[in-house]
């Protein structure tokens, strides 16, 4: 069954703490559409506030009104500096809390359990400050699923009040709507500036204030806006006692956002992110910011630069008397296309740099090559806040978040030198104080840390640049300032996590440790819910508290075996190497062509013919009927791995005398040059049959093609296939630069999508853009380190880039990694492909390789005339490789060994491939290469399955040639009985 995806996007505008989701379902073609088949049946928002902090819990009930099972995907951004700290999913009608699990392990367990048609729940952090979960199954005909997400946040200061703001401008009725807000330890009445309806009012009980409303069939149209007045200079300190004599503290200092004058620049660089994702920024806010800036800095030279998959210089403008109309018009007409590659950034020499971007480099790694003050400016809901802060901190600039701040106010960061937190005076009784690096004071300031002991006095320093101009004194008292039922430690952990994630790769282990202890979702840790307690035992995952007793009892009594992992593939690889060597030594000679026999022959001739027939060593008949090709899928031959080849000396006496297959053995010292056979590869372009291709039918030059593409892109902007097909047209018309721009835009379509990045890697390999092929492959490996194909793709990309040692190391990892039983079964036989590729590297680049760690039992000289490998970008997909030789014999899954020695690897029916065809010595004539799409079990944002075929002649001989074919499946449903012709050999 093809899985249909839902996507729920929670968009958070200014001061937003949550937002009602927009619900969409897959259109079956890689995009999404609005639908009333799945609705938000219930929305419950519960917020608890104490001091300047809040804990927010959002509960959603999704109802499936369709007649089919649905799989939901919820993707939502959270405000700057905030991470999800709680996740729960209903199991058998009851919410079960998630537990922290390493991100890669959570994915692996998810993939493994999914093979049993039981889906766990996983909440993970993807690129930027975005969080994603999947809900499956949602039963048909009114089935419901409940999920709950919790996060902690700090109230924002606006003027002399702290503000809690919740937008509730939903466009459709919600069958059940509940909102409840509780304010603790407040002596003053919270002020309702705006409320959803007349019933929502605060009621006081002691020093606790509560307001709530419960509606049915309700369409909320008014927002919730609560103000909390504050006195200037006041302090609010909350503490939570911990083990030993330690306490966590959170001190909120009510600061004035002071500033002092600075010399305004004479020249500025406006660096404008014009990648495809750039169109999603709020350009109106960006223009308001610039308008306010030029009102103050009225005479300045502005040089424009653009970053997408390339770095481009724009025009230069002279701003006079604050008139920036020309610049505004110029920026308003920018078109957005291509991926985002911060690795392309060039050195800029202007006094200051204004960098307008979301901070997500989707097509290359960040390289810092300038030291001029850089002001990173974000107006997008989806942004990599840590990347943006890193750039601004590194260059002594500032980060401006237009999405959560008024551009007219935050412009002062560009015009003045702001007051900054500069640290604390050394105090041995406090540790792990955050922030630990200088931080600009916007409206207020929060300091967190750990106190050892009962009390201390802490001196906090503020100033400009490196100059301390003000010191605040705060008193910490664990007895007097302790609060019950508030996780102050979670706020501390969040602050620490924010700093660690600025350098997430270097701090990977510490991020995991912190997330594991405090249940935070991070770039390295996810939150996971499993269906039954046995799975927690099996996969060695500590369960939530409600299952701990049952979990411990099972472990104690050893009633459930822990997951049986396959330690590595080395033993199978050794067996397969011997198998390949035996096959390689076996000599195949095709049956000579038989001519009509005369009817009048002598008796002796007949006898002689009969004598010969008695000793024929028969192979597979060359006259195969079409019935072979029509065998049912269920008829499987024994895996080549399980066959035994016997090289006998006896048949050698028949050499040259027997009709049929002649068998011999090859000398171990036979040179690779003896295998070289001059041949020709012809690849066939698989043309797209998409309806939009008619738009380009008369376009015969790159400029026209690109213009048509931009003109019609809005209609197809979420279809990767559209970019893929147009890029192919541009490559075909010899415009590699434009083709790469269109192709790279695929990277901006979704967050952490391995299917899209595999598609990119395939096409980049074909286009010989090897550095970007490596980047895409490494991203997939980062997201899916449990797939052997991830290491293989990275290895082959390293080889394309000339890094043969890294290629060898990553291929070898495929054989030395451990795998779950389910994934090992899925990829059974992959070692055959890996062995050929390891030995090809050794054969062609031995002098450049360190082989000390390579098992000699898998090393063998195995040159061949023909090698073909196909793989594809989707899991749970079955693509077949067919090769038809000059004798018209087809080698495929039901005929894995041919008369002339063709050999096909194991048939991969549930994973990403690969499948491989080998032929040691090519028979003279033409060979036909086809692929057959047998089936896929899901269609997501990536669209139809992408297939890559690597076609070699004289492989591992030192004279090998390669051609690449990449295409997307053209058949939307079912099997293509005729196959797709992708190439031919001729020898």
Kindly give the residue locations of the regions a language model identified.
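N-terminal, polar/Ser/Thr-rich
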Residues: 18-51, 116
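Short, small/polar-rich motifs associated with maturation and membrane association
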Residues: 592-678
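Intrinsic-disorder/low-complexity signal
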Residues: 841-987
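An acidic, Ser/Thr-enriched
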Residues: 86-91, 97-125, 134-139, 146-271, ...
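Generic helix N-cap/helix-start motif at coil->alpha-helix transitions
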Residues: 369-371, 684-688, 716-723, 736, ...
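Von Willebrand factor
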Residues: 261-356, 360-362, 383-384
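VWA/integrin I-like adhesion module and closely mimicked acidic/polar interface patches used
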Residues: 357-402, 406-413
């Amino acid at each position: 069954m093809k899985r249909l995806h839902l996507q729920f996007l929670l968009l958070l505008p200014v001061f937003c703490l949550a937002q009602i989701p927009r619900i969409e379902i897959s259109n079956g073609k890689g995009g999404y559409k609005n639908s009333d088949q799945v609705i938000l049946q219930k929305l419950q928002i519960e917020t608890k506030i104490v001091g300047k902090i809040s804990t927010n819990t959002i509960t959603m009930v999704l109802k499936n009104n369709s007649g089919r099972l649905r799989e939901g995907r919820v993707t939502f951004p959270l405000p700057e500096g905030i991470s999800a700290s709680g996740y729960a999913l209903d199991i058998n009608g009851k919410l079960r809390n998630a537990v922290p699990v390493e991100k890669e392990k959570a994915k692996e367990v998810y993939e493994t359990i999914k093979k049993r048609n039981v889906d766990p729940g996983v909440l993970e952090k993807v690129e930027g400050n975005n969080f994603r979960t999947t809900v499956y199954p949602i039963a048909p005909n009114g089935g419901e699923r409940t999920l709950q997400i919790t996060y902690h946040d700090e109230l924002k200061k606006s003027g002399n009040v702290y503000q809690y703001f919740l937008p509730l401008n939903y466009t459709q009725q919600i069958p059940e709507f509940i909102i409840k807000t509780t304010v603790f330890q407040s002596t003053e009445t919270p002020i309702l500036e705006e409320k959803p309806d007349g019933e929502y009012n605060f009621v006081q009980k002691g020093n606790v204030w509560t307001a709530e409303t419960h509606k049915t069939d309700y369409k909320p149209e008014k927002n919730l806006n609560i103000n909390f007045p504050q006195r200037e200079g006041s302090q609010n300190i909350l503490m939570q006692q911990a083990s030993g004599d330690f306490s966590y503290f959170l001190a909120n200092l009510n600061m004035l956002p002071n500033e002092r004058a600075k010399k305004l620049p004479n020249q500025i660089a406006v660096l404008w992110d014009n990648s495809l994702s750039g169109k999603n920024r709020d350009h109106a806010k960006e223009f308001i910011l610039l308008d306010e800036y030029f009102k103050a800095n009225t005479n300045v030279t502005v040089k424009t630069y653009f970053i997408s998959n390339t770095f481009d210089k724009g025009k230069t403008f002279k701003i006079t008397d604050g008139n920036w109309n020309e610049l505004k018009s110029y920026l308003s007409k920018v078109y957005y296309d291509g991926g985002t590659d911060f690795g392309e950034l060039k050195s800029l020499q202007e006094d200051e740099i204004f960098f307008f971007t979301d901070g997500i480099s989707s097509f290359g790694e960040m390289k810092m090559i300038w030291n001029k003050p850089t002001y990173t400016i974000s107006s997008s809901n989806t942004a990599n806040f840590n990347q943006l802060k890193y750039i601004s901190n590194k260059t002594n600039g500032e980060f401006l978040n237009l999405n959560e701040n008024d551009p007219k106010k935050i412009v002062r960061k560009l015009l003045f030198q702001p007051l900054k937190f500069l640290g604390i005076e050394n105090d041995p009784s406090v540790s792990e104080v955050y922030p630990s690096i200088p931080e600009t004071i916007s409206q207020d300031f929060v300091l967190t840390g750990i106190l050892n002991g009962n009390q201390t006095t802490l001196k906090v320093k503020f100033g400009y640049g490196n100059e301390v101009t003000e010191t605040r004194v705060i008193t910490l008292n664990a007895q007097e300032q302790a609060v019950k039922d508030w996780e102050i430690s979670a706020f501390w952990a969040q602050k620490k996590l924010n700093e660690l994630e600025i350098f997430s790769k270097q701090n990977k282990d510490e991020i995991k440790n912190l997330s594991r202890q405090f249940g935070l979702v991070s770039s390295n840790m996810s939150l996971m819910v499993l269906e039954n307690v046995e799975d927690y035992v099996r996969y060695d995952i500590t369960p939530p508290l409600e299952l701990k007793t049952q979990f411990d009892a099972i472990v104690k009594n050893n009633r459930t075996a822990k997951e049986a992992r396959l330690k590595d593939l080395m033993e199978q690889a050794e067996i397969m190497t011997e198998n390949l060597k035996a096959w390689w030594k076996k000599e195949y000679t095709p049956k000579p062509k038989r001519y009509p026999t005369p009817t009048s022959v002598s008796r002796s001739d007949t006898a002689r013919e009969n004598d010969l027939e008695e000793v024929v060593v028969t192979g597979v008949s060359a006259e195969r009927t079409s019935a072979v090709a029509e065998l049912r899928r269920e008829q499987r031959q024994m895996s080549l791995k399980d066959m035994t080849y016997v090289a006998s000396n006896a048949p050698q006496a028949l050499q040259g005398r027997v009709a049929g297959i002649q068998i011999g053995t090859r000398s171990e010292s036979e040179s690779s040059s003896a295998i070289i056979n001059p041949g020709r590869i012809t690849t066939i372009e698989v043309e797209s049959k998409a309806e939009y291709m008619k738009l380009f039918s008369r376009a015969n030059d790159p400029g026209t093609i690109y213009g048509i593409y931009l003109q019609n892109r809005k209609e197809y902007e979420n279809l990767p296939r559209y970019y893929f097909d147009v890029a192919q047209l541009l490559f075909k018309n010899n415009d590699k630069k434009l083709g790469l721009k269109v192709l790279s835009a695929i990277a901006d379509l979704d967050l952490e999508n391995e299917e899209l990045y595999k598609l990119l890697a395939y096409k980049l390999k074909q286009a010989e853009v090897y550095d970007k092929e490596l980047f895409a492959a490494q991203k997939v490996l980062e997201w899916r380190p449990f797939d052997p194909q991830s290491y293989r793709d990275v290895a082959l990309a390293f080889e394309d880039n000339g890094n043969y040692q890294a290629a060898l190391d990553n291929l070898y990892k495929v054989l030395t990694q451990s795998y779950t039983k389910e994934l090992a079964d899925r990829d059974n036989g992959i070692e055959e492909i890996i062995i050929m590729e390891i030995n090809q590297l050794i054969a062609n680049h031995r002098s450049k390789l360190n082989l000390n760690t390579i098992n000699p039992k898998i090393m063998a000289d195995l040159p061949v005339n023909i090698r073909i490998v196909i793989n594809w970008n989707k899991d749970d997909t079955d693509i077949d490789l067919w090769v038809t030789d000059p004798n018209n014999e087809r080698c495929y899954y039901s005929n894995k060994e041919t008369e002339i020695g063709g050999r096909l690897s194991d048939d991969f029916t549930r994973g990403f491939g690969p499948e491989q065809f080998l032929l040691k010595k090519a028979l003279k004539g033409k060979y036909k290469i086809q692929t057959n799409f047998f089936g896929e079990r899901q269609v997501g944002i990536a669209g139809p399955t992408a297939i890559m075929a690597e076609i070699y002649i004289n492989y591992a001989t030192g004279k090998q040639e390669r051609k690449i074919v990449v295409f997307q499946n053209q058949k939307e449903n079912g099997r293509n009985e005729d196959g797709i012709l992708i190439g031919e050999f001729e020898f």
